[in-house]
Amino acid sequence: MAEYHIIMRISSLFALFLLFLQPALAEGLPELGDTAQLSLTPQAERRVGESIMRDIRLHDPDFADDPEVAEYLNAIGYRLVSNSQDARQDFEFFLVKDPTLNAFALPGGYIGVHTGLIITAQSESELAAVLAHEIAHVTQHHMARMVSKDGQLSTAVLAAMALAILARNSQLGSAAAAIGQASAITAQIGFTREFEREADRIGFLTLEKSGFDVRAMPAFFVRMQRAGRLYENNAPAYLRTHPVTTERIADAENRIQGVAYKQTPDSLDFQLVRAKLRADQGTARDALAQLEGDLREKKFSNETAARYGLAVALLRGKDPVRAEAELAPLLKTTDHPMFSGLLARIKQAKGDNKGAADTLRQALVRYPNNRSLNYAYIEALQQLGQNREAVSQLDQQIKNYPRDARLYALQAKGYASLGKRLLQHQAQAEVYVLQGSVSSAIEQLQLAQKSGDGDFYQLSSVDARLRDLKLQLAEETKQAKEKK
């Protein structure tokens, strides 16, 4: 019975991928079993990626909505992107709650990173090496080139892409044999060796230009190869989609020969993010015991990060008093936004919402552009009933990040508390737009029209947005009919 559910999951992912890919293609997809000419433009790749990401955010229980970790991943990611072959490409790096050691690239610049990769990375340069490799897959448009190889598109290739991108569970890979075209799918899973070599070469250059230790790349490959031999059929997930060959290791080792050694210490950001994720592993009791044991036995690379992780675990274990005591010495010696964020959460757990808001307000003076602190501050203001100030903060944040659904959701909540129904429905409409539900957004704008409040300019704004969305929905409906 379990195998049946696994197979159905694969089938649904494949169908989902076809559904997402279809609107983006200029010529449409072929019937199952046929082949056809295909051109997947960068714009189409982005639309495909956006569609898949919307589904991941809404329906994937493993999607980790952690602003602090996301902020770090995007900081290190864009440090690499700025030194890549296409710095103009938009990227978004996101976290996946999965203990396996893996990362993957979606079409259009979306790169998922498993918690297991961050936790087990032996250095920040090692994490950067994996990200640089995934960035190269995107900038070299390997997904589009895989689809259009030899000018042909086959159902097997599409199925393989769906599996490689979406089926992270090792059981899915083993159950793929139950699908009729198993041999063709197996042959296509993962990127081709040619693409892997190209991503290694370009990723290496990006890693070097970004100031990381390039020796981390072959070191990571060697570690993965050893893990593959040790675990055989239960090899790390990275090996199943990015096979590490002796040739790849040799190529990476040859590249570092001409590079002068440069000591590259890990950033405190990396150390803290890794400590936070370790504190979130397993049960609260097990995580706490592990972290206390590591500190007692001095099994850590950075004591500040280790004690921060312990404070996170203590708060998770509903002991805010001990958590604050553990954090207090760190606050005296080191200023970091993650410390301020944790202190605010500790104060909230102790029932001191005003103290939490004050902590966040003071931190934002030092870190005004920190998104996780801004989210937390707005939520703290709303908890205190200070909705006018919260809405004022949201207006500024939305100007900076106009495609952030979380901000619009908070804005809708704030306007609802203030009794501003038109603005509430208008904000909620933008949440639905960003989630890909245009019809739901239209319903919200129609409710805004009937709200009975709002001035002439606000009503005019609602009317204009409603017209635009109706045209968009009509065009999407037309395209869907043409594809049938």
Language model: regions and residue ranges:
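Membrane-active amphipathic alpha-helices enriched in small hydrophobic residues
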Residues: 154-169, 175-187
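Short alpha-helical catalytic segment bearing the HExxH-like zincin motif
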Residues: 112, 126-134, 138, 174, ...
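Extracytoplasmic and endomembrane cell-envelope/extracellular-matrix remodeling and assembly machinery
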Residues: 32-39, 50, 62, 71, ...
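Hydrophobic or amphipathic, alpha-helical segments that drive membrane association/targeting
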Residues: 2-104, 227-230, 289, 353, ...
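Short pre-active-site segment immediately N-terminal to the catalytic Zn-binding motif
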Residues: 112-129, 189-194
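Catalytic Zn2+-binding segment of zinc metalloproteases
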Residues: 125, 135-152
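TPR/TPR-like alpha-solenoid repeats
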Residues: 111, 120, 138, 259, ...
